[in-house]
Amino acid sequence: AEYRIPTLDTWTSYVGIIDMVVNEYDKYKMYFMNVANDFALATLYVDFGKDILADKMGWKTTVVMQEDTAFGGGVFELVDQMLAPEAGIKIIDHIVYDTNTVDFSPIFNKAVKSKPDFIYLISSVRSQVPSSQYVKLQVPVPMTGINVAAFGKDFWNDTGQMGGGTSTLSPIPSVGFAMDDRTQAFVDKYEAKYGNSRPIFPHFNGFNAYYGIYNAFNAAERAGGFAPLDAWVTEMENEDLKIYKDGKLWLRYAFWKPGEIEPRTQREYTHNIKFDITQPLDDGAPSMVVIQWYEDGTTAVVYPEKYKTGEFTVPSWIKQ
Protein backbone atom coordinates (compact mmCIF):
# COMPACT_ATOMS: atom_id res chain seq x y z
CA ALA A 1 0.00 0.00 0.00
CA GLU A 2 2.83 2.39 0.81
CA TYR A 3 4.34 2.18 -2.67
CA ARG A 4 1.02 1.91 -4.57
CA ILE A 5 2.30 -1.02 -6.64
CA PRO A 6 -0.18 -3.23 -8.55
CA THR A 7 -0.09 -6.57 -6.72
CA LEU A 8 -1.33 -10.01 -7.74
CA ASP A 9 -1.08 -12.51 -4.88
CA THR A 10 -1.13 -16.05 -6.25
CA TRP A 11 -0.91 -17.99 -3.01
CA THR A 12 -2.25 -16.48 0.18
CA SER A 13 -5.65 -17.48 1.46
CA TYR A 14 -5.80 -15.31 4.59
CA VAL A 15 -9.20 -13.63 4.60
CA GLY A 16 -7.87 -10.84 6.81
CA ILE A 17 -6.04 -9.37 3.82
CA ILE A 18 -9.26 -9.29 1.82
CA ASP A 19 -10.99 -7.65 4.77
CA MET A 20 -8.36 -4.91 4.64
CA VAL A 21 -9.30 -4.24 1.01
CA VAL A 22 -12.99 -4.21 1.95
CA ASN A 23 -12.52 -1.88 4.93
CA GLU A 24 -9.87 0.47 3.49
CA TYR A 25 -10.47 0.23 -0.23
CA ASP A 26 -8.62 3.39 -1.29
CA LYS A 27 -5.51 2.31 0.62
CA TYR A 28 -5.40 -1.31 -0.56
CA LYS A 29 -7.26 -1.29 -3.89
CA MET A 30 -4.13 -2.26 -5.84
CA TYR A 31 -4.14 -5.71 -4.19
CA PHE A 32 -5.76 -8.74 -5.86
CA MET A 33 -5.78 -12.32 -4.52
CA ASN A 34 -6.48 -14.99 -7.13
CA VAL A 35 -6.83 -17.97 -4.82
CA ALA A 36 -9.95 -18.50 -2.73
CA ASN A 37 -9.70 -17.25 0.85
CA ASP A 38 -9.99 -19.24 4.09
CA PHE A 39 -13.75 -18.79 4.39
CA ALA A 40 -14.29 -20.24 0.92
CA LEU A 41 -11.86 -23.09 1.53
CA ALA A 42 -13.62 -23.95 4.78
CA THR A 43 -16.90 -24.51 2.96
CA LEU A 44 -15.29 -27.35 1.00
CA TYR A 45 -14.07 -29.00 4.22
CA VAL A 46 -17.64 -28.94 5.43
CA ASP A 47 -19.30 -30.03 2.17
CA PHE A 48 -16.90 -32.94 1.58
CA GLY A 49 -17.21 -33.96 5.21
CA LYS A 50 -20.98 -33.97 5.07
CA ASP A 51 -21.60 -35.35 1.57
CA ILE A 52 -18.86 -37.97 1.39
CA LEU A 53 -17.32 -38.75 4.78
CA ALA A 54 -20.56 -38.67 6.78
CA ASP A 55 -23.38 -39.37 4.32
CA LYS A 56 -21.70 -41.71 1.79
CA MET A 57 -19.15 -43.47 4.00
CA GLY A 58 -21.16 -43.30 7.22
CA TRP A 59 -18.21 -42.00 9.23
CA LYS A 60 -19.00 -40.11 12.42
CA THR A 61 -15.72 -39.95 14.38
CA THR A 62 -12.18 -38.85 13.57
CA VAL A 63 -8.75 -38.38 15.09
CA VAL A 64 -6.95 -35.29 13.79
CA MET A 65 -3.20 -35.70 13.18
CA GLN A 66 -1.82 -32.19 12.83
CA GLU A 67 1.71 -30.96 12.22
CA ASP A 68 3.03 -28.40 14.72
CA THR A 69 3.01 -25.36 12.43
CA ALA A 70 1.00 -22.14 12.19
CA PHE A 71 -0.64 -23.57 9.07
CA GLY A 72 -1.56 -26.77 10.87
CA GLY A 73 -3.00 -24.90 13.82
CA GLY A 74 -5.05 -22.62 11.61
CA VAL A 75 -6.54 -25.48 9.62
CA PHE A 76 -7.32 -27.39 12.80
CA GLU A 77 -9.33 -24.42 14.07
CA LEU A 78 -11.41 -24.48 10.89
CA VAL A 79 -11.90 -28.24 11.08
CA ASP A 80 -12.76 -28.08 14.78
CA GLN A 81 -15.18 -25.17 14.42
CA MET A 82 -16.84 -26.13 11.13
CA LEU A 83 -16.28 -29.71 9.98
CA ALA A 84 -17.26 -31.37 13.23
CA PRO A 85 -20.45 -29.47 14.10
CA GLU A 86 -21.72 -28.85 10.56
CA ALA A 87 -20.95 -32.29 9.12
CA GLY A 88 -21.86 -34.16 12.29
CA ILE A 89 -18.37 -35.64 12.71
CA LYS A 90 -16.92 -35.79 16.23
CA ILE A 91 -13.21 -35.26 16.88
CA ILE A 92 -12.31 -37.88 19.51
CA ASP A 93 -8.57 -37.11 19.70
CA HIS A 94 -6.21 -34.39 18.49
CA ILE A 95 -2.57 -35.36 17.97
CA VAL A 96 0.02 -32.65 17.24
CA TYR A 97 3.34 -33.94 15.89
CA ASP A 98 6.73 -32.35 15.24
CA THR A 99 7.55 -31.72 11.58
CA ASN A 100 10.91 -33.48 12.05
CA THR A 101 9.22 -36.74 13.02
CA VAL A 102 10.68 -39.71 11.12
CA ASP A 103 8.87 -42.59 12.87
CA PHE A 104 5.11 -42.26 12.74
CA SER A 105 4.29 -45.72 14.09
CA PRO A 106 3.68 -44.51 17.70
CA ILE A 107 1.48 -41.69 16.36
CA PHE A 108 -0.57 -43.98 14.15
CA ASN A 109 -0.84 -46.51 17.00
CA LYS A 110 -2.20 -43.80 19.28
CA ALA A 111 -4.72 -42.75 16.64
CA VAL A 112 -5.87 -46.32 15.98
CA LYS A 113 -6.37 -47.02 19.71
CA SER A 114 -9.03 -44.30 19.79
CA LYS A 115 -11.01 -46.40 17.26
CA PRO A 116 -12.02 -43.54 14.94
CA ASP A 117 -13.88 -44.05 11.70
CA PHE A 118 -11.09 -42.17 9.94
CA ILE A 119 -7.93 -40.10 10.50
CA TYR A 120 -7.83 -36.47 9.37
CA LEU A 121 -4.24 -35.52 8.47
CA ILE A 122 -3.12 -31.88 8.32
CA SER A 123 0.36 -31.78 6.80
CA SER A 124 2.25 -29.24 4.70
CA VAL A 125 5.87 -30.01 5.68
CA ARG A 126 7.42 -33.32 4.54
CA SER A 127 3.98 -34.82 4.01
CA GLN A 128 5.57 -37.71 2.13
CA VAL A 129 6.76 -39.22 5.43
CA PRO A 130 3.40 -39.87 7.14
CA SER A 131 1.90 -40.79 3.74
CA SER A 132 4.43 -43.52 2.93
CA GLN A 133 4.49 -44.86 6.49
CA TYR A 134 0.69 -45.05 6.49
CA VAL A 135 0.98 -47.46 3.55
CA LYS A 136 4.04 -49.31 4.84
CA LEU A 137 2.41 -49.90 8.24
CA GLN A 138 -0.93 -50.69 6.59
CA VAL A 139 -2.72 -48.57 9.17
CA PRO A 140 -6.19 -50.15 9.51
CA VAL A 141 -8.08 -46.84 9.52
CA PRO A 142 -8.91 -44.71 6.44
CA MET A 143 -7.10 -41.37 6.22
CA THR A 144 -7.96 -38.13 4.43
CA GLY A 145 -7.37 -34.43 5.09
CA ILE A 146 -4.85 -31.93 3.75
CA ASN A 147 -1.62 -33.35 2.38
CA VAL A 148 0.32 -30.68 0.50
CA ALA A 149 2.90 -33.07 -0.99
CA ALA A 150 0.08 -34.99 -2.67
CA PHE A 151 -0.84 -31.92 -4.75
CA GLY A 152 1.94 -32.69 -7.21
CA LYS A 153 2.79 -35.50 -9.60
CA ASP A 154 6.17 -35.86 -7.85
CA PHE A 155 4.34 -37.35 -4.86
CA TRP A 156 4.22 -40.93 -6.17
CA ASN A 157 7.98 -41.23 -6.61
CA ASP A 158 8.69 -39.19 -3.48
CA THR A 159 6.82 -41.78 -1.42
CA GLY A 160 8.59 -44.70 -3.07
CA GLN A 161 5.29 -45.53 -4.79
CA MET A 162 3.65 -45.83 -1.39
CA GLY A 163 1.11 -43.04 -1.63
CA GLY A 164 -1.93 -45.13 -2.50
CA GLY A 165 -5.04 -44.28 -0.52
CA THR A 166 -3.97 -40.70 0.12
CA SER A 167 -6.73 -38.16 -0.43
CA THR A 168 -6.49 -34.43 0.08
CA LEU A 169 -8.07 -31.11 -0.64
CA SER A 170 -6.24 -29.48 -3.55
CA PRO A 171 -6.20 -26.20 -5.48
CA ILE A 172 -7.45 -26.40 -9.05
CA PRO A 173 -6.64 -27.53 -11.64
CA SER A 174 -5.12 -30.52 -9.86
CA VAL A 175 -3.67 -33.93 -10.57
CA GLY A 176 -6.53 -36.11 -11.76
CA PHE A 177 -8.45 -33.05 -12.97
CA ALA A 178 -10.22 -33.19 -16.35
CA MET A 179 -8.46 -30.43 -18.27
CA ASP A 180 -10.08 -28.10 -20.75
CA ASP A 181 -8.24 -27.62 -24.05
CA ARG A 182 -6.60 -24.32 -23.11
CA THR A 183 -5.29 -25.57 -19.78
CA GLN A 184 -4.14 -28.86 -21.29
CA ALA A 185 -2.13 -26.92 -23.86
CA PHE A 186 -0.39 -25.07 -21.02
CA VAL A 187 0.33 -28.37 -19.24
CA ASP A 188 1.77 -29.89 -22.42
CA LYS A 189 4.03 -26.89 -22.97
CA TYR A 190 5.15 -26.91 -19.33
CA GLU A 191 5.92 -30.64 -19.31
CA ALA A 192 7.81 -30.42 -22.60
CA LYS A 193 10.09 -27.77 -21.13
CA TYR A 194 10.29 -28.66 -17.43
CA GLY A 195 9.09 -32.27 -17.25
CA ASN A 196 12.52 -33.57 -16.28
CA SER A 197 12.89 -31.23 -13.30
CA ARG A 198 10.86 -30.55 -10.18
CA PRO A 199 7.99 -29.92 -10.11
CA ILE A 200 7.15 -32.08 -13.13
CA PHE A 201 3.61 -30.67 -13.19
CA PRO A 202 2.48 -27.05 -12.56
CA HIS A 203 0.76 -27.78 -9.28
CA PHE A 204 -0.16 -25.72 -6.21
CA ASN A 205 -0.36 -22.10 -7.41
CA GLY A 206 1.01 -22.75 -10.89
CA PHE A 207 -2.27 -22.45 -12.75
CA ASN A 208 -3.69 -19.41 -10.98
CA ALA A 209 -0.32 -17.67 -11.37
CA TYR A 210 -0.38 -18.45 -15.10
CA TYR A 211 -3.91 -17.20 -15.68
CA GLY A 212 -3.46 -14.33 -13.23
CA ILE A 213 -0.70 -12.89 -15.40
CA TYR A 214 -3.17 -12.84 -18.29
CA ASN A 215 -5.61 -10.92 -16.05
CA ALA A 216 -2.98 -8.37 -15.04
CA PHE A 217 -1.61 -7.71 -18.52
CA ASN A 218 -5.00 -7.71 -20.24
CA ALA A 219 -6.12 -5.09 -17.71
CA ALA A 220 -2.96 -3.07 -18.31
CA GLU A 221 -3.47 -3.19 -22.06
CA ARG A 222 -6.97 -1.74 -21.74
CA ALA A 223 -5.86 0.80 -19.12
CA GLY A 224 -2.87 2.00 -21.11
CA GLY A 225 -0.38 0.46 -18.68
CA PHE A 226 -0.04 -0.24 -14.97
CA ALA A 227 -0.07 3.48 -14.28
CA PRO A 228 -2.07 5.50 -13.52
CA LEU A 229 -3.05 3.04 -10.80
CA ASP A 230 -6.79 3.78 -10.69
CA ALA A 231 -7.24 2.96 -14.37
CA TRP A 232 -5.51 -0.40 -13.97
CA VAL A 233 -7.52 -1.24 -10.83
CA THR A 234 -10.78 -0.52 -12.66
CA GLU A 235 -9.78 -2.77 -15.54
CA MET A 236 -8.66 -5.55 -13.18
CA GLU A 237 -12.09 -5.37 -11.55
CA ASN A 238 -13.56 -5.81 -15.04
CA GLU A 239 -11.38 -8.83 -15.85
CA ASP A 240 -13.43 -11.98 -16.38
CA LEU A 241 -11.55 -14.87 -17.97
CA LYS A 242 -13.99 -17.75 -18.43
CA ILE A 243 -12.78 -21.15 -19.59
CA TYR A 244 -15.25 -23.78 -20.80
CA LYS A 245 -15.14 -27.56 -21.15
CA ASP A 246 -17.81 -29.46 -23.07
CA GLY A 247 -20.05 -26.41 -22.97
CA LYS A 248 -19.78 -25.99 -19.18
CA LEU A 249 -18.07 -23.17 -17.32
CA TRP A 250 -14.99 -24.96 -15.97
CA LEU A 251 -12.58 -22.33 -14.68
CA ARG A 252 -13.07 -18.64 -14.01
CA TYR A 253 -10.50 -15.97 -13.26
CA ALA A 254 -12.40 -12.86 -12.22
CA PHE A 255 -12.57 -10.83 -9.01
CA TRP A 256 -15.26 -9.76 -6.57
CA LYS A 257 -16.00 -6.07 -6.98
CA PRO A 258 -16.54 -3.54 -4.17
CA GLY A 259 -19.97 -3.98 -2.62
CA GLU A 260 -20.65 -7.43 -4.10
CA ILE A 261 -21.98 -9.96 -1.59
CA GLU A 262 -21.18 -13.67 -1.88
CA PRO A 263 -24.56 -15.36 -1.37
CA ARG A 264 -23.60 -18.34 0.80
CA THR A 265 -21.43 -16.60 3.39
CA GLN A 266 -23.11 -13.19 3.02
CA ARG A 267 -19.73 -11.42 3.03
CA GLU A 268 -17.81 -9.06 0.81
CA TYR A 269 -14.59 -10.38 -0.72
CA THR A 270 -13.39 -7.36 -2.69
CA HIS A 271 -10.54 -8.32 -5.04
CA ASN A 272 -10.56 -12.01 -4.11
CA ILE A 273 -10.93 -14.45 -7.01
CA LYS A 274 -14.60 -14.93 -7.87
CA PHE A 275 -15.09 -18.45 -6.51
CA ASP A 276 -18.40 -20.32 -6.52
CA ILE A 277 -19.22 -22.33 -3.37
CA THR A 278 -22.90 -22.99 -4.03
CA GLN A 279 -24.07 -26.05 -5.97
CA PRO A 280 -24.29 -26.62 -8.92
CA LEU A 281 -21.11 -24.51 -9.25
CA ASP A 282 -22.20 -22.92 -12.52
CA ASP A 283 -21.06 -19.35 -11.79
CA GLY A 284 -17.36 -19.97 -11.26
CA ALA A 285 -14.81 -22.50 -10.12
CA PRO A 286 -14.93 -24.20 -6.70
CA SER A 287 -12.52 -23.06 -4.00
CA MET A 288 -10.82 -26.46 -4.13
CA VAL A 289 -11.44 -30.08 -5.10
CA VAL A 290 -10.66 -33.34 -3.31
CA ILE A 291 -8.21 -35.63 -5.08
CA GLN A 292 -7.20 -39.20 -4.35
CA TRP A 293 -4.12 -41.25 -5.16
CA TYR A 294 -4.93 -44.89 -5.89
CA GLU A 295 -2.68 -47.86 -5.21
CA ASP A 296 -1.65 -48.16 -8.87
CA GLY A 297 -0.29 -44.61 -8.93
CA THR A 298 -3.24 -43.06 -10.77
CA THR A 299 -5.18 -40.07 -9.50
CA ALA A 300 -8.70 -38.72 -9.69
CA VAL A 301 -10.85 -35.88 -8.47
CA VAL A 302 -13.42 -37.43 -6.14
CA TYR A 303 -15.33 -34.27 -5.10
CA PRO A 304 -17.31 -32.16 -5.93
CA GLU A 305 -19.62 -34.05 -8.27
CA LYS A 306 -19.25 -31.64 -11.22
CA TYR A 307 -15.49 -32.22 -11.41
CA LYS A 308 -15.41 -35.87 -10.32
CA THR A 309 -13.23 -38.24 -12.38
CA GLY A 310 -13.16 -41.15 -9.92
CA GLU A 311 -14.64 -42.55 -6.72
CA PHE A 312 -13.53 -41.97 -3.14
CA THR A 313 -12.27 -45.31 -1.84
CA VAL A 314 -10.37 -46.79 1.09
CA PRO A 315 -7.11 -48.74 0.67
CA SER A 316 -7.39 -52.44 -0.16
CA TRP A 317 -5.95 -53.57 3.18
CA ILE A 318 -8.82 -51.94 5.09
CA LYS A 319 -11.88 -54.10 5.48
CA GLN A 320 -15.06 -52.03 5.79
Where would I find each of the regions flagged by the language model?
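Hydrophobic alpha-helical
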Residues: 1-2, 79, 109, 116-137, ...
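Extracytoplasmic ligand/sensor domains, especially the bilobed periplasmic-binding protein
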Residues: 1-93, 142-168, 175
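Segments of small-molecule ligand-sensing domains
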Residues: 193-203, 217-302
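Extracellular/periplasmic periplasmic-binding protein-like sensory domains
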Residues: 14, 35-39, 134-211, 221-222, ...
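Residue-level signal for nonpolar/aromatic packing positions in well-ordered secondary structure
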Residues: 49, 62, 79, 119, ...
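Soluble receptor-associated domains flanking membrane spans
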Residues: 14-18, 51-52, 86, 185-193, ...
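Flexible glycine/proline-enriched surface loops and loop-helix/loop-strand junctions
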Residues: 27-31, 60-65, 112, 167-172, ...
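Structural motif
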Residues: 41-46, 97-111
